[in-house]
């Protein structure tokens, strides 16, 4: 029997399953990798917004990570919501010990509802602790603005932001997601690496049900990197995956509903095999 590839997510929770660790694990499963999860924050949230946040003590995060790494090694790691500087330092310790493992950062700073999930000091700390270790960072436009200090209102500013991530912050790769810009009917993302810039375009779907898109997108990239896929191929798969998940949203909840994490499986005709 072939052992499955393992992807580890380190993030907050969502009891309604649309974002955070819950969304990541579903995305890993849909990509055919074994998912593991370490919780950083217990978040009371739903499709209407974030109601309460309880950040776990960094020692509790350390204990979870210790349990994982003392037993097995993931083939790729992603981080999502990390709300305290102490927790960032804890995670950095494990990443430094395992630098060969691909690392994806989804710099979760704002919920879809607009709720802030990270204070200013922690945002600054992110730039010095985790971003320089990342194989790829996946901010949306508001998050890229928070990190770079730019007002990103043009393609020229997107290019400038990408250069800041690569040349100044030190990330190996950065995808600036244009899904938050409503100027066109096309969702265009920009992948920056030391080798240059590549773009990805997909149809933009007119729907409010986009809760957890950033989590899902970065989780699929993580899963594909765990399989050994090159970054470009991983991003290409993630774009297809997220487009289908938005197109076939399950319309759950009374607010901004989640995407469909199993739409890609069904479209590919694999769901019947998995249910046997």
Swiss-Prot record:
UniProt keywords (A-Z) are: ATP-binding, Kinase, Nucleotide-binding, Thiamine biosynthesis, Transferase
Q: In which pathway does it act?
A: Cofactor biosynthesis; thiamine diphosphate biosynthesis; 4-amino-2-methyl-5-diphosphomethylpyrimidine from 5-amino-1-(5-phospho-D-ribosyl)imidazole: step 2/3; Cofactor biosynthesis; thiamine diphosphate biosynthesis; 4-amino-2-methyl-5-diphosphomethylpyrimidine from 5-amino-1-(5-phospho-D-ribosyl)imidazole: step 3/3
Q: What class of enzyme is it?
A: transferase
The record lists 4-amino-5-hydroxymethyl-2-methylpyrimidine as bound by 45
InterPro entries reported for this sequence: HMP/HMP-P_kinase_dom, PM/HMP-P_kinase-1, Ribokinase-like
Which reaction equation describes what this protein catalyses? 4-amino-5-hydroxymethyl-2-methylpyrimidine + ATP = 4-amino-2-methyl-5-(phosphooxymethyl)pyrimidine + ADP + H(+); 4-amino-2-methyl-5-(phosphooxymethyl)pyrimidine + ATP = 4-amino-2-methyl-5-(diphosphooxymethyl)pyrimidine + ADP
Q: Which domain of life is it from?
A: Bacteria
Q: Carries keyword Endoplasmic reticulum?
A: no
**Which one of the record's GO molecular function terms can you name?**
ATP binding
| Family listed | Belongs to the ThiD family.
Outline what the protein does.
Answer: Catalyzes the phosphorylation of hydroxymethylpyrimidine phosphate (HMP-P) to HMP-PP, and of HMP to HMP-P.
Protein name per the record:
Hydroxymethylpyrimidine/phosphomethylpyrimidine kinase
